[in-house]
Structure formats: C-alpha cells, structure tokens
Design a protein with these regions (language model features):
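Bacterial Sec-dependent N-terminal signal peptides
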Residues: 1-24
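N-terminal accessory beta-strand-rich subdomains and adjacent acidic, glycine-rich linkers
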Residues: 24-232
Length: 232
C-alpha cells in the first residue's frame, strides 16, 4: 500500500472540493440567504433568497478589463518580454478561470448617530462572507466581499496589492442581477457623477418608459443609459 500516494490523492480531492464548494450566508434575522459558488468554467456565481423564495437567480460576477496594446509600453506592467495578442486576451479576463482559495465569515453590529437626517440612530448590522479567488492562468487573485443585512445584500470587488494586478482599466462590469420577476423598484437614473434625483417607484419593465420623466434637468445630471439606474 502506497501511503504517500493515497495521502496525495486525498489532499487533491479535498482541494478540489474546496475549490467548488458552495458557500452560504444568512442575514442576521435569518430571512435572507445567499449562496456563492464557482461554475464549471470557474466563474463566480451567487443567488439570493428571501424567506426560502428565490429572488435573484444564479448570477455571474466578474470584470472585463481593457485589453492592453502590445505596441504601447506604457499600457501594461513591464516585463522584458513583449506579450503576444493571445496573452493579452487572457489577461483581460477577470471573470472566468477562478479557484476558491479561502472563505471567511464574520458578523458586525454597531449603532451610530448621524449629524443630521431622518433617523436619530442608525444600526449597521450584517453578516459577511469574503471569498478569495485565485486565477491561475493570470497568476493573480481578487476578493469578493458580500455583506448581507436584514434589508438586502451588498458586495464589492477588492484587489490586494500584487505583481500581476497593479494597474488596469475596467472595460465592462459583468456583475449580473438575474431577477426572478418584474419586481417593484425604487430607483434614480444611473449617472456618472451625481445622485441629485428624486426617487421613482415602478416595475423593472417600466424603467425605459419612465426614464425621461425621472430626469429633472440640472447641470449636475448626466445619465449614462436609458435603462441604467441605481435601485433600492
């Protein structure tokens, strides 16, 4: 019996299981549940349920970076070798080919007093899941941090300092929100540099038809899309 080979196989199987294992996170009151996993192509995928009813279907996460120009020295992080076009195509991919390196959960609860506003005190209470994702093909990693509150979910991408991800331009955000129906939303037009809008209440399907009415023109408003919104 080759004990060394068996131990190696067990370690490999454990790593493979860890790389694809589904992670779960619940809100402090237990009403919301989020799941996170990697699909067959190593793409990050999440879902969200409320009281055991799915509200966000499997939705992918990730970023598409601006493809670097091999003929411009200033565009990419310097190496002695000039990259070929295929390598640059792969390098622009920050949405596939990940493996799960680590997953950490935590809870945070504080109450703070705003200087002014409608509420005397505001409670900041959430459960957190931070997943560290390695991308072997590009020798880099990123963290996706989820925070699940009693009234909703938030997440962000984090890029710790590392040799192969120092400078980059985001071409396209590939974060998906695959809603399960034509839900009601409280929204303002998505803008480049302001939130100076009144909120509109409507179904998701009504966004395009109401966009012009929602824009009360002033010098600070520059909507970027007829359906681009910030929602609540």
């Amino acid at each position: 019996m080759n004990i060394k080979k068996n131990l190696t196989l067990i370690a490999y199987l454990l790593c493979t299981f860890m790389a694809h294992a589904q992670q779960k996170l619940t809100s402090p009151n237990g009403n919301f549940e989020m799941t996170f996993e990697l699909d067959a192509k190593g793409a990050p995928v999440y879902t969200l349920s409320y009281k055991n009813q799915l509200v966000i279907k499997p939705s992918k996460l990730g970023l598409e970076l601006k493809k670097e120009d091999a003929n411009k020295q200033t565009d990419f992080e310097w190496t002695d070798e000039k990259p070929n076009q295929a390598d640059l195509d792969v390098k622009a991919d920050l949405y596939n080919g990940f493996v799960l390196k680590d997953a950490q959960t935590s809870t945070f609860d504080e109450t703070w007093v705003p200087v002014w506003g409608e509420e005397k005190e505001i409670r900041n209470h959430y459960n957190e899941l931070a997943v560290t994702l390695d991308q072997p093909k590009n020798k880099r990693f990123m963290i996706i941090r989820f925070r699940l509150f009693d009234d909703g979910l938030g997440f962000r991408y984090e890029f710790p300092q590392q040799p192969n991800l120092n400078y980059f331009i985001i071409k396209e955000e590939r974060s998906q929100f695959a809603m399960t129906g034509d839900h009601k939303a409280f929204w303002i037009p998505g803008d480049y540099d302001t939130q100076e809008y009144d909120y509109t209440e409507s179904r998701l399907s009504e966004l395009r038809g109401l966009m012009k009415k929602a824009i009360t023109r002033n010098s600070s408003q520059t909507p970027f899309s007829p359906t681009g919104v910030q929602t609540a």
